[in-house]
Regions:
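Conserved ABC ATPase signature
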Residues: 215, 219-274, 281-297
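Electropositive, glycine-dotted interaction segments
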Residues: 90-224, 229-232
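N-terminal pre-Walker A segment at the start of P-loop NTPase domains
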Residues: 1-17
Length: 380
């Protein structure tokens, strides 16, 4: 079973002054108005994964540099970004956590980030630090080395998989040159990449080594698109492969670009959520894009399957039909309060009387949950 992410703390990042979010359910569904900060919570988790593999400078550069993503309100701009991740509590009611603080590199390029501090800490009644790293010119991440050190190793057995397995997936690009439509190396098959660029290679390995998972993926795609027969996964002579598929009743083979946008996105989602090599924490921003209501129902079921198998699934969505497939306990409402992102969970005791007549999504649509546009808040 994968190590589970239990808590996320974000401070000074985009629209987030400070947010503390406990992830108490297998699936967490973030809902809120446009500009409330759902995608910023997703981006904070993506930044952590980039710090883990030391690609965060490029990640920040492509977003305009760290100075462009610091929280700002009428009182000024934040001087740092802090992110903390904690897994669930162990049997001793304790857990090890990881925290990182980023600041602009005022000694060099102010758009470049400097790691002011990385730390491992044991969370419990005293929240005592296990290991602390302070850098004078910390332009690179050493979190892997910290986690592997002799001093910290015995504390972080549950933490390292959380950091390694925190993955944000983006399947929204279905343009003509979308990654999922292109060629990839047949050997690039250990796990599905975040943009599905190696989906054909990955599906080939799943078919050869994990036939039950492969059949579940095929069955899910057939349920969403009944005309679908199977994938055609055959590497070329130079060990390159691309996604192809067959339609029932026809002899010809179709390319990925001949699938509808919704069908291609659903193939990527099914491959991720039903595959054998799911990361510990799966994060998806607006996964419902382009999906038929029947496919949205299947998406919810696949997310639950991943959650039941020891993975955390975090969905940020605008979809009332998708929200309707989840319980109030799985919902987190994201609002803008006093110019900053704030999160809370619905009051189940207050709302349970309505659930006999209304779905969770309908309650959201009727503004019983919050997470709707507020005219008292300025737009982004």
């Amino acid at each position: 079973m994968a190590a589970e992410l239990g808590r996320l703390v974000v401070e000074g990042f985009r629209s987030i002054r400070r947010v503390e979010l406990d992830l108490t359910t297998d699936v967490t569904v973030l809902i809120g108005a446009n500009g409330s900060g759902k995608s910023n919570l997703v981006s904070a988790l993506e930044l952590v994964s980039r710090i883990w593999d030391d690609s965060f400078q490029d990640y920040l550069y492509r977003r305009g540099g760290i100075s462009n993503i610091l929280f700002e309100d009428g009182e000024g701009r934040a001087d740092h970004i802090l992110i903390e991740l904690l897994p669930g509590f162990n049997e001793d009611d304790r857990r090890s956590g990881y925290g990182v603080t980023l600041v602009p590199d005022l000694l060099g390029d102010s758009d470049r980030a400097r790691i002011q501090e990385q730390r491992l800490f044991q969370a419990g009644s005293d929240r005592s630090d296990i290991h602390r790293e302070i850098f004078r010119h910390g332009l690179r991440s050493s979190v892997r080395q910290i986690a592997d050190s002799e001093e910290a190793r015995r504390y972080v057995e549950s933490l390292t998989p959380v950091l390694e397995g925190c993955r944000v997936f983006h399947f929204d690009d279905v343009s003509g040159d979308a990654p999922a439509k292109g060629w990839s190396t047949a050997g690039d098959d250990l796990s599905l990449r975040s943009n599905a660029e190696n989906i054909a290679a990955y599906l080939l390995r799943v078919r050869e080594d994990h036939s039950r998972h492969y059949q579940r993926i095929v069955a899910a795609v057939r349920a969403a698109a009944p005309f679908f027969d199977d994938f055609v996964l055959e590497p070329s002579s130079n060990e390159r492969i691309r996604l192809r598929w067959r339609q029932r009743g026809l002899d010809r083979t179709f390319l990925a670009r001949e699938a509808s946008d919704g069908m291609l996105r659903f193939i990527c989602l099914a491959t991720l959520l039903l595959g054998p090599d799911r990361p510990a924490t799966i994060i998806l921003d607006e996964p419902e894009l382009g999906l038929h209501p029947a496919a949205i129902h299947l998406l919810a079921e696949m997310a639950r399957i991943a959650g039941r198998n020891g993975h955390k699934v975090i969905l940020a969505t605008q979809s009332v039909p998708l929200v309707s497939h989840f319980e109030l306990s799985e919902i987190v409402i994201v609002d803008r309060v006093d110019g900053a992102t704030a999160v809370h969970r619905p009051d189940e005791d207050l709302l349970k009387a309505f659930l006999d007549d209304y779905s969770t999504g309908t309650l959201w649509e009727m503004n019983f949950l919050g997470g709707r546009p507020s005219h008292t808040e300025a737009a982004l």
